[in-house]
């Protein structure tokens, strides 16, 4: 029995799509095919997929809403798991519990409806709750670390554990999950009682700022660089004269230099080449080395063509 036949038998009932283009699920609108794109409906299906992948030695990864990710043009080998169907959100007093696939912006709106404050900073951050925890997403002085009470995860070995904020060792755009290989299942956020109108006014203000300053009208990978200590990445890029700088179909936004935008059917290679070129030019101009915030995943097109049969153990 081939691995694919075994997969269809053991993972029967789970939504698995073969050779699925990743660009349909990415904010960048680029990316090659995933060998197996999986949409588990609950944590039990997710655990089944992870267990099967581990047993068969098939690589796997979980993507949130792919808002701060570039999938290379050659695609991703193995399983790519999208958790957007794990999206339940509940409110208990001043606590919101959200599954990993819940939309982060919608979760902040649920907090607003219940007059809970503390989540306003995230009202315009695209992505999923799980992805936000993974990278300790933040904006306008707030971040996930400030409000996370606990986080339920599936370890890479298939065990379910509950972690505290301390366990997650949050840092700037970092959590311990990035090294552990665990998968976020659900998160509890500790908020505070507030006034609906005050919360709404703050969310409206932050949303307006984001619309004013960021190129939301174009596909992009979000904020491409982490903030260097004592500096702003966008300012360093602007000072080097790089606004409007373009490689292929991707260019540095004139509106916000920290964003690389897809203006003309750009490719993942265009994104990657532009980001690397910006890093080099900023280093040359200011002596400061920018660090990528966006994650780059998968294989280049040239590598994928060398192994046109896909992931070797998975005979199709």
Swiss-Prot record:
Limits of the FAD-binding PCMH-type domain: 30-194
Gene Ontology biological-process entries: cell division; cell wall organization; peptidoglycan biosynthetic process; regulation of cell shape
Gene Ontology CC entries for this record: cytosol
Required co-factors: FAD
Cellular compartment(s): Cytoplasm
SUPFAM superfamilies: FAD-binding/transporter-associated domain-like, Uridine diphospho-N-Acetylenolpyruvylglucosamine reductase, MurB, C-terminal domain
Keyword Iron-sulfur belongs to the record: no
Family from the record: Belongs to the MurB family.
Protein name: UDP-N-acetylenolpyruvoylglucosamine reductase
UniProt source species: Streptococcus pneumoniae serotype 19F (strain G54)
